[in-house]
């Protein structure tokens, strides 16, 4: 990952780097890999995440249809 520093503005470059890492999911992956996760726990977590995403999508869809 590469970020250019313009006008010696390191703070702005650091913010850009953090934003890129966040978008790529690096922080989330690091957090998940801090400890070993059993395959059964991983499967349960992924299933719960999928359910959460589906509910969120349904909520947004209902809100859009309700607004029309």
UniProtKB/Swiss-Prot annotation:
The keyword Repressor does not apply. PROSITE patterns: RIBOSOMAL_S21 (PS01181). This is Small ribosomal subunit protein bS21. One of its GO terms (biological process) is translation. The keyword DNA repair does not apply. Gene3D superfamilies: Ribosomal protein S8. InterPro entries: Ribosomal_bS21, Ribosomal_bS21_CS, Ribosomal_bS21_sf. One of its GO terms (cellular component) is ribonucleoprotein complex. Belongs to the bacterial ribosomal protein bS21 family. One of its GO terms (molecular function) is structural constituent of ribosome. Disulfide bonds: none annotated. Keywords: Ribonucleoprotein, Ribosomal protein. HAMAP family: Ribosomal_bS21 (MF_00358). It holds the Pfam family Ribosomal_S21.
């Amino acid at each position: 990952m590469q970020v250019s520093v313009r006008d010696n503005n390191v703070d702005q470059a650091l913010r850009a780097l953090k934003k890129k890492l966040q978008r790529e999911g690096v922080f989330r992956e690091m957090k998940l890999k801090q400890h070993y996760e059993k395959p059964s726990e991983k499967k349960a977590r992924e299933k719960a995440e999928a359910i959460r995403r589906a509910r969120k999508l349904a909520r947004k869809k209902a809100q859009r249809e309700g607004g029309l």
